[in-house]
Amino acid sequence: MAVQKSRKSRSRRDMRRSHHRMEIAEISIDATTGEKHRRHHMTKDGFYRGRQLFKVSQDA
């Protein structure tokens, strides 16, 4: 197994982890319903880019 020669400093550790942050989700507002949804995802009503792709039942 590989064993490090010397301990890494907090600065080096944190610089390595600087890319591990959480990204903020891109939010869009649907033109037809005005509902907020994630980019490139359809809304809960079944609309995507102004067209209804699926008919969603109201049972759920």
From Swiss-Prot:
SUPFAM superfamilies: Zn-binding ribosomal proteins. GO terms for biological process: translation. Residues 1-22 are annotated as: Disordered. Keywords: Ribonucleoprotein, Ribosomal protein. GO terms for cellular component: large ribosomal subunit. InterPro entries: Ribosomal_bL32, Ribosomal_bL32_bact, Ribosomal_zn-bd. Residues 1-20 have a biased composition (Basic residues). GO terms for molecular function: structural constituent of ribosome. It holds the Pfam family Ribosomal_L32p. Belongs to the bacterial ribosomal protein bL32 family. NCBIfam families: rpmF_bact (TIGR01031). This is Large ribosomal subunit protein bL32. It comes from Psychrobacter arcticus (strain DSM 17307 / VKM B-2377 / 273-4). The lineage of its organism: Bacteria, Pseudomonadati, Pseudomonadota, Gammaproteobacteria, Moraxellales.
